[in-house]
């Protein structure tokens, strides 16, 4: 959404007041107003405005080039951690596991992420850490009032964590370098 927000505009002022998105169990307060977020959210079955980074990658997963585009991207599927991790994890990568939608694509991206991580010379610091998933079912009434809270453990450093982290690092470092080369300060 940042490309569509003009400095000093009412939306920019709201974002500056809120400063960041706040995440909490069962909800969040977005930095941008909901009507702006809804234009960019990755809802399945629609085309969303996006700043895309395309990487040219050799057969041995070496990045040989890149291209950035402002475009509309068709969202064919919105893959969620809690749906993917049971079928895409350390065990299924080693043993093969059952087929599932996007398995080949996720495996290919995981292989790229592994090479990107090795190229940085920095293994993930969170390999053996535990994280938690929180959810609140506001439709369920409990003795304490509305909202049943569920907290589940999940291991950090999973193949999906690595895939997301390494591709975000690649995007941030690629765009950071481009901004630096152009003499443009940015956060």
Question: Regions from the language model: what does each represent?
Answer:
Residues 1-187:
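Electropositive polyanion-binding surfaces
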């Amino acid at each position: 959404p940042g490309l569509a927000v003009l400095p000093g505009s009412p939306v920019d002022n709201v974002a500056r007041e809120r400063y960041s998105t706040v995440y909490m169990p069962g909800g969040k307060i977005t930095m941008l107003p909901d009507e702006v977020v809804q234009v960019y959210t990755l809802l399945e079955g629609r085309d969303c405005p996006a700043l895309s980074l395309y990487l040219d990658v050799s057969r041995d997963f070496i990045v040989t080039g890149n291209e950035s585009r402002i475009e509309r991207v068709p969202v064919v599927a919105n893959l969620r951690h809690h749906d993917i991790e049971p079928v895409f994890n350390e065990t299924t990568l080693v043993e093969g596991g059952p087929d599932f939608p996007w398995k080949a694509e996720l495996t290919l991206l995981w292989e790229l992420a592994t090479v990107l991580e090795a190229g940085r010379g920095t293994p993930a610091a969170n390999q053996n850490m535990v994280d938690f998933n929180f959810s609140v079912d506001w439709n369920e009434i409990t003795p304490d009032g509305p909202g049943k809270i569920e907290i589940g453990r999940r291991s950090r450093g999973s193949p999906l964590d690595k895939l997301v982290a390494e591709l975000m690092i690649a995007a941030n470092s690629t765009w950071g370098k481009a901004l630096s080369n152009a003499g443009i300060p940015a956060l």
